[in-house]
Amino acid sequence: MRTSQYLLSTLKETPSDAEVVSHQLMLRAGMIRKLASGMYAWLPSGLRVLKKIENIVREEMNNAGAIEVSMPVVQPAELWQESGRWDDYGPELCRLTDRHNRPFVLGPTHEEVITSLVRYEVNSYKQLPLNLYQIQTKFRDEVRPRFGVMRGREFLMKDAYSFHIDKASLIETYERMHAAYCAAFTRMGLNFRPVQADTGSIGGTGSHEFQVLAESGEDLIAFSDTSDYAANIEMAEALAPAGERPAATAALTKVATPNVHTIDDVAAFLSVAPTAIAKTLLVLAEADEHGKQAVIALVLRGDHELNEIKAEKLPGVANPLTFANDEQIKAAAGCDAGSIGPVGFAGRIIVDRSAAHLADFVCGANETGFHLTGANWDRDIATYEVADLRNVVEGDPSPCGQGKLLLKRGIEVGHIFQLGTKYSEAMKASVLNEGGKSVTMEMGCYGIGVSRLVAAAIEQNNDQYGIIWPDAIAPFEVAIVPMNMHKSERVAEQAQQFYAELKAAGVDVLFDDRKERPGVMFADMELLGVPHAIVIGDRGLDNGVVEYKCRRSGEKQEVAITEIVAMLKAKLGR
């Protein structure tokens, strides 16, 4: 591609509304332009990257035995009503009506559509397993679109859905797709980790996320420093402290703590560490047959944070997790929120494993402006349950039994689920088994955020000058930068020759034939992130050489004119 015939719309200044580096560089490099909140037009350079990522994903899906299909973006509401997600999905589901006042949705995902299709096309176990995928635009009406294409409302996604006669077949395909995801992200040159994850609104029994490690990531992942264990912090298990709980030695004493509300306030006022304090949070229970909701006390160590995903999965706890309001706190504990404690609390008490290991601890006295010191389990609180309630912290022992946990930020670029029969049962998708009996199909679903991958790759691959693309997903693999070619016929001729040879070898090459100053040309090529560059000048041609420049390492070297094309072909595997 010649720049004189290309839309190369680079910007010198960083747009003020771009928060993360990927958004800044995608705008500056002329990859995208904002159309509306969370919606972007892809310009040629951005689309070239998007297509390369899409092709890698397609190849790995085909290698895994998946078959490509295409489904409508607009979906009839009755399918979502049939699955039960019409009411459950929330305001992110964009709903619309046609001229006949029939309700539809803009598809955020396609479980309902694919299940409806397959239930009419597949009727025998002989047609299973079946794995179908598409690469298509999705729409989710995010409350706060941000970070460019990282969290947009419209985005490109690969979504696959598998159908099986039994759980064993589902697990086999799930593992094959897990391997395909790893292969795809490795080919893209990404530093990523597969992690155990919550199934969220999609549902199902088992789930893994694929996280690209980056400081700008919205997710926090925990992984062992010595094994391959990794989990989203929502799912990472916090083990109980080792050893026996210390014996009680202090008497239970009520002390006045006026105007003390937070854990830090209590610790400072009583001269104790937050680790010696038990904090109590009140949440609502599931409604009984009369619609009434009791209040449940969740107790954690003062320095730990409640893991809301773990909490809402506890038997009897309302889902979604709902914290008691001031009026409910007053009715249940008889005090303000800052003075709640487990001693004397009349309702159900669930204690985190670490908090259950405390002895002689400080807690609220269930009387506004007072706390208790010297509190102890069993002696002062007879009835309670113990569960894993907290977020893990760095340095916790790994749940796998090997090493300690490290915490890193990640960008979720893929998510796979073992759905089981959640959708197939609701939508009556069944087949006849070998014995002629009708059985509900087991399902899996597998998503990759194709457009998000562009931003994630930039978050990992950039410097002060711009993007540094891995070869496999770069918009162009080689840039030809001829110095003053419009004043030097031999520079122009040599550039033309390299361009023709590289194109013939199947290399994506950008020939900068603009009438621009060399500094502008170099800056644009670095901003765009072209991995390899040939710089041609009269002085070098006098000596039979050109300059090769590697974008990632910054390495520069003189290479013979007769050898540069072969060297580049070797680097690119051509």
Swiss-Prot record:
Keyword Hydrolase tagged: no
Subcellular location(s) per record: Cytoplasm
Entries under NCBIfam families matching the protein: PRK09194.1, proS_fam_II
Assembly, per entry: Homodimer.
Domain notes: Consists of three domains: the N-terminal catalytic domain, the editing domain and the C-terminal anticodon-binding domain.
Function per UniProt: Catalyzes the attachment of proline to tRNA(Pro) in a two-step reaction: proline is first activated by ATP to form Pro-AMP and then transferred to the acceptor end of tRNA(Pro). As ProRS can inadvertently accommodate and process non-cognate amino acids such as alanine and cysteine, to avoid such errors it has two additional distinct editing activities against alanine. One activity is designated as 'pretransfer' editing and involves the tRNA(Pro)-independent hydrolysis of activated Ala-AMP.
GO biological process: prolyl-tRNA aminoacylation
One GO cellular component term: cytosol
Main subcellular location of this protein, as a coarse class: cytoplasm
Sorted UniProt keywords: Aminoacyl-tRNA synthetase, ATP-binding, Cytoplasm, Ligase, Nucleotide-binding, Protein biosynthesis
GO molecular function terms noted in the UniProt entry: aminoacyl-tRNA deacylase activity; ATP binding; proline-tRNA ligase activity
Keyword Protein biosynthesis assigned: yes
Catalytic reactions on record: tRNA(Pro) + L-proline + ATP = L-prolyl-tRNA(Pro) + AMP + diphosphate
SUPFAM superfamilies recorded: Class II aaRS ABD-related, Class II aaRS and biotin synthetases, YbaK/ProRS associated domain
CDD domains in alphabetical order: ProRS-INS, ProRS_anticodon_short, ProRS_core_prok
InterPro entries xref list: aa-tRNA-synt_IIb, aa-tRNA-synth_II, aa-tRNA-synth_II/BPL/LPL, Anticodon-bd, Anticodon-bd_dom_sf, Pro-tRNA-ligase_IIa, Pro-tRNA-synth_IIa_bac-type, Pro-tRNA-Synthase_IIa_type1
Enzyme class of the recorded protein, top EC level: ligase
Protein name as it appears in the record: Proline--tRNA ligase
Family named by the database record: Belongs to the class-II aminoacyl-tRNA synthetase family. ProS type 1 subfamily.
E.C. number(s) listed in UniProt: 6.1.1.15
PANTHER family: MITOCHONDRIAL RIBOSOME PROTEIN L39/PROLYL-TRNA LIGASE FAMILY MEMBER (PTHR42753), PROLINE--TRNA LIGASE (PTHR42753:SF2)
